């Protein structure tokens, strides 16, 4: 069974952050990740990764596909960010250029880059 990938919730600008008790259920904050917004669909058999604009990203991140298929216990949809961090542990930085190199027509290059600079998914 394939899940339809829904449209993601997008961040929006505000003039100021409201007080936490001014919003029903409170507030949650996270940093701005320098990556690709992605929706992941796992139906128990196949993994599909789509951009926030519904463009297919699955073929560009084989290491994520393999990890999702191995680690996700049940069918689900995940909303998150694909990033690549480079540098020594403790001083890593997200690398936009390394990430954008993954969108390449040659499968051999995508596979090589997935081994040299593996991506991470932050949900």
In which residue ranges do the predicted regions lie?
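Catalytic cores of nucleic-acid ligases and guanylyltransferases
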Residues: 1-123
